[in-house]
From Swiss-Prot:
SUPFAM superfamilies registered for this protein in UniProt: Nucleotide-diphospho-sugar transferases
Positions of Mg(2+) binding: D130, D132, H264
Its EC number(s): 2.4.1.58
MF annotations from Gene Ontology: lipopolysaccharide 3-alpha-galactosyltransferase activity; lipopolysaccharide glucosyltransferase I activity; metal ion binding
Binding site for UDP: 33-38, 130-131, 264-270
Protein name per UniProt: Lipopolysaccharide 1,2-glucosyltransferase
Any single biological process term in GO: lipopolysaccharide core region biosynthetic process
Annotated effect of mutating D132N: Loss of activity
């Protein structure tokens, strides 16, 4: 990169339990880029893909800044039980401090940019997924997807995001074209030839950068006119926050349907949180119960945003005492943070 310091990315672990006679000519390569808070989510996401796609070859790549022995043991078990190849990389984030981050998203959101660059040295195509994406169907069609000259196949973001993106990025041409970056199927050679990682980092380092969703916004700016749009089934966006207004907790069925292939649980509340006890997260629970993480306790609130979400959901679930206590905890953290 011309204007960005070299980033250290090292392979730390790799497991290959594929059968000796496996045909590797057709393989769906899947990558994740996360910090320590999302590692377990990656494990369950991988499990969900395996459960629904045992008929195809799968290779998984994870880029993270921190790992732990517990994760190593569980991901190795997942690889062995399902005859997978899984490769882990560690990224040194010291030189990423110049990039913007938010209260909700850490600088791990940029790991995908380095994943595209690194894996492009050995792979032709790659399916990138956020850790909060759960598979509930057959995605093998991607193996034979014609990109028709496009750099990436993506799914348009939900309608409320379209006009906001146009206003935020001052680009009317993005209306109806703004995509969600949680599911991206990429031609890595075209990405590299266009030097898109370098260009993205250059934009992100600019003093004029006012992106609300830095990684997603910059990818939309750079890939404008270079994308192929996939149907909503490949990135069905569902926000657990919507359960706060749905007393029946059945409205998710209007979005997550029989034809849905990939569910993207966006928002601060994730399906692995202790208070996410709704029918809409059953697809995550199915994968969890079939994974090495099945005996782990659900995640409790850590950040102030999670504390805020927790008390609201507890009250909706009629856990009034625990909800009030959680609300007090949130207010105390909010007050003492000032």
């Amino acid at each position: 990169m011309d204007s960005f310091p070299a980033i250290e990315i090292d392979k730390v672990k790799a497991w290959d339990f594929r059968l000796a006679n496996i045909n590797t000519s057709e393989c769906l390569n899947v990558a994740y880029g996360v910090d320590a808070n999302y590692l377990d989510g990656v494990g369950v996401s991988i499990t969900s893909i395996v459960l629904n796609n045992r008929h195809i070859n799968l290779d998984f790549y994870i880029i993270a800044d921190v790992y732990n022995d517990g994760f190593f043991q569980k991901i190795a078990k997942l690889a062995e039980q399902n005859q997978l190849r899984i490769t882990l990389y560690r990224i040194n984030t010291d030189k990423l401090q110049c990039l913007p981050c938010t209260q909700v998203w850490s600088r791990a959101m940029y790991f995908r940019l380095f994943a595209f660059q690194l894996l492009g040295l050995t792979l032709d195509r790659l399916l990138y997924l956020d850790a909060d994406v759960v598979c509930k169907g057959d995605i093998s069609q991607l193996l034979h997807l014609g990109l028709n000259g496009a750099v990436a196949a993506v799914v348009k973001d939900v309608e409320p995001m379209q006009e906001k993106a146009v206003s935020r990025l001052s680009d009317p041409e993005l209306l109806g074209q703004y995509f969600n970056s949680g599911v991206v199927y990429l031609d890595l050679k075209k990405w590299a030839d266009a030097k898109l990682t370098e260009k993205a980092l250059s934009i992100l380092m600019s003093k004029d950068n006012v992106y609300k969703y830095p990684d997603q916004d910059v990818m939309n700016v750079l890939l404008k006119g270079m994308t192929l749009f996939l149907p909503r089934e490949y990135n069905t966006i569902y926000t657990i926050k919507s359960e706060l207004k749905d007393k029946t907790h059945q409205n998710y069925k209007k979005l997550i349907t029989e034809s849905t292939l990939l569910i993207h649980y966006t928002g601060a509340t994730k399906p692995w949180h202790k208070w996410a006890i709704y029918p809409s997260v059953k697809y995550y629970k199915i994968a969890l119960e079939n994974s090495p993480w099945k005996d782990d306790s659900p995640r409790d609130a850590k950040s102030i945003i999670e504390f805020k979400k927790r008390y609201k959901h507890l009250l909706v679930q009629h856990h009034y005492i625990s909800g009030i206590i959680a609300g007090v905890c949130y207010l105390c953290r909010k007050y003492y943070r000032k």
